[in-house]
From Swiss-Prot:
It comes from Mycobacterium tuberculosis (strain ATCC 25618 / H37Rv). Gene3D superfamilies: 3.10.50.40, Trigger factor ribosome-binding domain, Trigger factor, C-terminal domain. Residues 428-466 are annotated as: Disordered. One of its GO terms (molecular function) is peptidyl-prolyl cis-trans isomerase activity. This is Trigger factor.
């Protein structure tokens, strides 16, 4: 078999393939044997009919069509393996010559990974916001803790923000009662913004057994999106009494003996949370800095697949009702055109990010170890509240393990970029990134690390992008 590659663009090639007819003869023999078992010819036992008679019965052209169709995937795969191209997605195959006894010729056009040269990581500079912790941050955490230990007490006064009320709701559209929108005895914290838009404003100032009518759009049911007249009736009003922030409260709410110790602990928690936020900012800023220095050509089919995935996710909550989706966008002050433009821009950036990080991982010869995969499984399973083994089975059943493998490999490439870069805050202070991104692994340590699967990184990454 012979094959040549034509570069149509930085992201697309045409592979020209020529297969000698002699290489197809074994395929013909196998096909004849299978047909002989299925086709009954008078005077011959099943499986014993001569090839010539089978060919006459089925037709040579039909046989040839079947053989060629069966042979194309493997011959295309062989041509790809013999080249240095890395396909993305499915090829567009066209048979250009197909005659019995002569060489088979076909072309395959396919998007490929563009050749990308990552920049010098040691020259990379990243700047992010500094971590600032004020008394207001600690006060907010303390207030949240006091709220958790607060008690609700019935009061005989009008509703105020922060109260917890018991309410009844009913709604009408054009004078018609909407049974699905009615509820009794709902508990609602005023000011939380939950339940229905406009509800908080409606109940403030009402006393027990008083009602008010306000206008709101229904969010669900057959009248979803329509304006409704909503009646809210307050049945009871309770205020939340908070414990005093003193030593006694510290002993009640924590393992500390004094409020000062509790505040110090809350300050540490705030700092840790802000360090995690800063780490995410470093991660994103590093990717942006890399993208600014590298031209990443975009494979159109890959971008379209990413865009389709975004749209699919957006429509899934509406049973893929695009008309309703378009209506909701208008209600939110947007439009389908604006959504599509924003989604395509995001898809293009995501594709650039993936391709660049894959190229960086190739250049750095990143290997995904068993520990790396285990760490990702444990972290992800905690987010979903399931056991790691259960998550592994779920991913394996849906053939999503290659996607996770590719994501982990890209994350390791990001860590390497962050470690090599100069990272400072906007005040000029150097930031120690080792807590969240780890320390650079030496060449000797990298060689000793056990890879998750020899050669699996590229295969997994390719499968994840098809």
């Amino acid at each position: 078999m012979k094959s040549t590659v034509e570069q149509l663009s930085p992201t697309r090639v045409r592979i020209n393939v020529e297969v000698p007819f002699a290489e197809l003869e074994p395929d013909f023999q196998r096909a004849y044997k299978e047909l002989a078992k299925q086709v009954r010819l008078p005077g011959f036992r099943p499986g014993k009919a001569p090839a010539k008679l089978l060919e006459a019965r089925i037709g040579r052209e039909a046989m040839l069509d079947q053989i060629v169709n069966d042979a194309l995937p493997s011959r295309y795969g062989q041509a790809v393996a013999e080249s240095d191209v890395q396909p993305l997605g499915r090829p567009n195959i066209e048979v250009t010559k197909k005659e019995y006894g002569q060489d088979l010729q076909f072309t395959a056009e396919v998007d490929i990974r563009p050749k990308i040269s990552p920049p010098d990581l040691s020259a990379l500079t990243v700047s992010v916001d500094p971590i600032e912790i004020g008394e207001d941050d600690v006060d907010a955490e303390l207030q949240s803790l006091r709220t958790r230990f607060g008690t609700l007490t019935a009061v005989d006064r009008p509703v105020a923000v922060g109260d917890v009320v018991s309410i009844d709701l009913s709604a009408t559209v054009d004078g018609e009662d909407i049974p699905n929108a009615a509820a009794e005895g709902l508990s609602h914290e005023v000011g939380s913004g939950r339940l229905i838009a406009g509800l908080d404003d409606a109940v403030v100032g009402l006393s027990a057994d008083e009602s008010r009518v306000f206008t709101a759009k229904l969010a669900a049911g057959e009248h979803a999106g329509q304006e409704a007249q909503v009646t809210v009736t307050v049945r009871s009003v309770k205020e939340r009494e908070l414990p005093e922030p003193d030593d006694e409260f510290a002993q009640l709410a924590s393992e500390f003996d004094s409020i000062d110790e509790l505040r110090a602990s809350l300050s540490d928690q705030v700092r840790q949370a802000k360090r995690a936020q800063q780490a995410e900012q470093i991660r994103n800023a590093t990717i942006d800095a890399l993208l600014e220095q590298v031209d990443v050509p975009l494979p159109e089919s890959y971008v379209q697949a990413q865009f389709d995935s975004v749209l699919h996710s957006a429509l899934s909550g509406l049973n893929h009702d695009e008309a309703r989706f378009n209506e909701l966008l208008v209600e939110q002050g947007s439009s389908r055109a604006a959504f599509d433009a924003e989604a395509r821009t995001a898809s293009e950036k995501d594709v650039k990010r993936q391709l660049l990080l894959d190229a960086l991982a190739d250049e750095l010869q990143v290997q995904v170890g068993q520990d790396d995969l285990t760490e990702r499984l444990v972290t992800t399973s905690r987010q979903y509240g399931i056991e790691p083994q259960q998550l592994f089975g779920y991913l394996q059943e849906r053939n999503q393990l290659p996607t996770m493998f590719a994501d982990v490999r890209r994350e390791l490439a990001i860590r390497a970029a962050v470690e090599a870069a100069t990272v400072t805050d906007s005040d000029g202070n150097t930031i120690d990134t080792s807590e969240f991104f780890g320390k650079r692994v030496s060449a000797g340590e990298a060689e000793e690390a056990e890879p998750a699967d020899e050669g699996a990184a590229r295969a997994a990454s390719d499968e994840a992008t098809t």
